[in-house]
Regions:
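Proline-aspartate-enriched helix->loop->beta-strand connector
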Residues: 162-163, 212
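Alpha-helix-loop-beta-strand connector modules within alpha/beta enzyme cores
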Residues: 87-102, 188-211
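Beta-strand-rich recognition/accessory modules
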Residues: 1-18
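Hydrophobic, well-ordered secondary-structure elements that form the walls
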Residues: 97, 169, 285
Length: 317
């Protein structure tokens, strides 16, 4: 019955899902839980060497690549240029990861214009709201100028560094609230959601022109039939070290996601975890593609053997 619902969305509502490349269904290594913002290119290259040997087919480089600041928050979002300290040779770095047989995806926070970003002065008066706890404002995409700027940043990232995809975070922050300015004549959309759909459809088309197999990830809380129009990877919401939440999240996503790739939240564990505990965590991801986020260089050999066994098992089945 639920399968028919997914078909109904596509056939009757004309909500056609994005193309799902084979790479979207492969296991990925993620930097978020293992490193947070403390990342740099040589360190990640060593991790990728180990990950590739185990069968991981891609890396998702999360928050931190765009700033030297490691204090969390989103004050430096908006410019979307690699940190010259952490990633001084970004293009060569991506090429090296490609040479290992792995895809390369970068995290971007779509809505945030950070107060410490270079673009802040230009767009600080075109915000849906300012979030003090984030040290950033939410871009008002009812302005064509804002949409074009955001799209240009993401297209340039993919083009300039030969990226295979983007992890697009916080899309749910695009909404109207008490602080949202009223519509004015300089806007070409009245409704934020209409502007968002228009931008995302355009962006997906632009990215596919660069790479027909572009990978786009969104996570739970902002998933549904419409998000599948421009996203081909749907991930379980953040649930670090919660095995049951990961399994339930995978099942929930699989029920109505059709052919769209479904990924686990990034699996992690305590450094003192026994092999049996690691095995249980990995087993809970059997219903989708694995994302892993532990420092492989620091794992004991017996832990690496468990990961390798799991990877071989999932590739077989």
């Amino acid at each position: 019955v639920l399968g028919k619902v997914e078909t109904w969305w596509k056939d009757k509502c004309k909500i056609v899902p994005a193309i799902v490349p084979e790479a979207a269904k492969m296991p990925f290594y993620s930097t978020w839980y293992s490193y947070h913002q403390n990342i740099e290119e040589k360190q990640l290259e060593r991790e990728c060497e180990l990950a590739a040997q185990m069968g991981f087919k891609g890396i998702i480089v999360d928050d931190g690549w765009q700033t030297d600041d490691n204090h969390r928050g989103y004050a430096f979002c908006g410019d979307w240029k690699p940190s010259e300290t952490k990633f001084p040779h970004m293009k060569e770095h991506v090429a090296y990861v490609h040479s290992l047989g792995m895809k390369y995806m970068l995290w971007v926070s779509i809505p945030f214009i950070g107060k410490n970003s270079g673009i802040w002065k230009k767009f600080s008066d075109k915000l849906l709201e300012y979030q003090e706890d984030m040290n950033a404002g939410v871009a008002d995409i009812r302005y064509k100028e804002i949409r074009e700027y955001l799209m240009e940043q993401y297209v340039d990232l993919v083009k300039n560094y030969d990226l295979d995809g983007l992890k697009m975070d916080f899309i749910d922050e695009f909404h109207e609230g008490a602080a949202t300015p009223e519509y004015n004549e300089n806007m070409d959309f009245r409704d934020v959601q209409d502007a968002l759909e228009h931008m995302m459809v355009q962006l997906y088309e632009k990215l596919r022109e660069l790479n027909p197999d572009i990978l786009i990830e969104f996570r739970q809380k902002y998933v549904g039939p419409y998000i599948r129009k421009f996203g081909n990877i749907l991930r379980v919401d953040d649930c670090p070290m919660s095995q049951l939440s990961n399994r339930v999240g995978l099942v929930d996503l699989r029920i109505l996601s059709g052919d769209t790739a479904v990924h686990s939240d990034m699996v992690m564990w305590n450094k003192a975890e026994e092999p049996e505990g690691v095995a249980i965590a990995l087993q809970h991801c059997f219903f989708g593609s694995l994302q892993l986020s532990v420092r492989l260089e620091e794992c004991k050999q017996e832990i690496l053997e468990v990961i390798r066994y799991y990877m071989e098992l999932t590739q077989e089945w």
